């Protein structure tokens, strides 16, 4: 009987061990599955990120992110976010990163960055019959920007001596509204990424005039939380550079923008 008890005990221990090992494997697999999807937060901002006719996210950043994360072994879930709360969302972990024509300029200490992967001009646009031809002509004028964007900071801080004092700076929550305000004459000018202005004119068959003198040439990057030490940001940085070098980024950008090569000239941006 004693021998039978010992054998039974050994069998019981073995069964428990196998069960626990199975549970551990299941938990591990679950964690790996959870890690395999990167949640990318972005605003609706054509041509970088927008919903196509089928309601599926598409655009320059969506295609670049999908390819980059695929090379890294991840799937990407692109979600539309409240752009004004982007920092809060990435720091809380609700999203893994921010990628939506997001300028690195003036924000280097706020996030952990991958990039720059695109160079973009911040410009001022006016109606075709406007008497505004250079930045100094904006003195006393009313100008609209999307809130929390780089142009808003440029006109609020006025650290650049070329930037005059406006009559009013109108900050609006959505990028489309700034063009509506300009088209209806509620403001004299708008400031935004040049690609956004060009895309809006194309989509709505409307003509604005872009001032030749840019506000700034900025680098576009992917932002992760400052405390994110998973190494994904650094891997993303290397992968985006590989895509720039092997021609993948050029092929993606040329689907959306004319003269795509100029947007990849990021080496002299100083980041």
Please identify what each model-predicted range represents.
Residues 1-10:
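Bacterial N-terminal signal peptides that target proteins for export
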Residues 19-22:
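C-terminal motif of bacterial Sec signal peptides marking the signal peptidase cleavage site
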Residues 24, 62-71, 129-132, 136-150, ...:
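Extended ligand-binding regions for polar small-molecule ligands
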Residues 30-101, 171, 235-236, 246:
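Extracytoplasmic small-molecule ligand-binding "clamshell" domains
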Residues 42-44, 119-126, 202-238, 259-271:
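Periplasmic-binding protein-like
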Residues 53, 65-74, 151-173, 201-205:
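Ligand-binding cleft/hinge of the Venus flytrap
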Residues 66, 75-137, 209, 214:
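Acidic, polar ligand-binding/catalytic clefts
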Residues 85-88, 101-110, 154-157, 181-217:
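A ligand-binding cleft/hinge motif common to bilobed small-molecule-binding domains
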């Amino acid at each position: 009987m004693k021998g039978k008890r010992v054998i039974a005990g050994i069998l019981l221990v073995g069964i428990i061990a196998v069960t626990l090992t199975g549970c551990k494997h299941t938990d591990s697999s679950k964690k790996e599955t959870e890690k395999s999807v990167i949640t990318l937060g972005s605003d609706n901002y054509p041509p970088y990120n927008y919903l196509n006719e089928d309601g599926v996210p598409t655009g320059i950043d969506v295609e670049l992110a999908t390819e980059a994360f695929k090379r890294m072994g991840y799937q990407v879930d692109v979600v539309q976010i409240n752009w004004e709360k982007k920092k809060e969302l990435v720091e809380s972990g609700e999203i893994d990163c921010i990628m939506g024509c997001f300028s690195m300029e003036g924000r280097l200490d706020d996030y952990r960055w991958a990039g720059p992967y695109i160079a973009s001009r911040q410009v001022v646009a006016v109606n075709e019959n406007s008497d505004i031809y250079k930045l100094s002509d904006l003195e006393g004028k009313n100008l609209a920007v999307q809130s929390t964007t780089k142009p808003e900071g440029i006109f609020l801080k006025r650290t650049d001596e070329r930037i005059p004092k406006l009559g009013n700076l109108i900050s609006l929550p959505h990028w489309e509204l700034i063009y509506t305000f300009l088209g209806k004459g509620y403001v004299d000018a708008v400031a935004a990424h040049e690609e956004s202005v060009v895309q809006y004119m194309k989509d709505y068959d409307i003509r604005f005039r872009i001032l030749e003198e840019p506000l700034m040439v900025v680098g576009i990057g992917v932002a992760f939380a400052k405390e994110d030490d998973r190494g994904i940001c650094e891997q993303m940085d290397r992968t985006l550079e590989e895509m720039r070098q092997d021609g993948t980024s050029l092929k993606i950008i040329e689907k959306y923008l004319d003269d795509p090569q100029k947007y990849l000239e990021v080496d002299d941006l100083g980041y």
